[in-house]
């Protein structure tokens, strides 16, 4: 099971989301904790200025950006639509 931490940026972005999407975020984070779900969540490496970071999908529009702290620990950096990569 993966331990998940949150940055202040993630918490602020999460607080701005619509309530219905917040529930989806909670469910996706819970799924992310189990590596078996990473393919379904489309966990992927980011490139360019976000090299070293990873992302996973909530749906077709929304993403979570994170970094691995260790093999079993991740820190979530932000959540939002594709503009989080700008």
Segments the model singles out, each with a brief description of its role:
Residues 31-56:
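A short, surface-exposed loop/turn module that caps and links secondary-structure elements
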Residues 4, 8, 12, 16, ...:
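Enriched for short, Lys/Arg-rich terminal
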């Amino acid at each position: 099971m993966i331990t998940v931490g949150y940055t202040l940026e993630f918490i602020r972005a999460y607080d701005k989301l619509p309530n219905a999407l917040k529930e989806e975020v909670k469910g996706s984070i819970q799924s992310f904790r189990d590596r078996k779900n990473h393919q379904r969540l489309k966990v992927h490496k980011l490139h360019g200025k976000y090299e070293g970071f990873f992302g996973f999908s909530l749906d077709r529009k929304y993403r979570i950006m994170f970094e691995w702290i260790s093999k079993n620990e991740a820190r979530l950096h932000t959540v939002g639509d594709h503009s989080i990569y700008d």
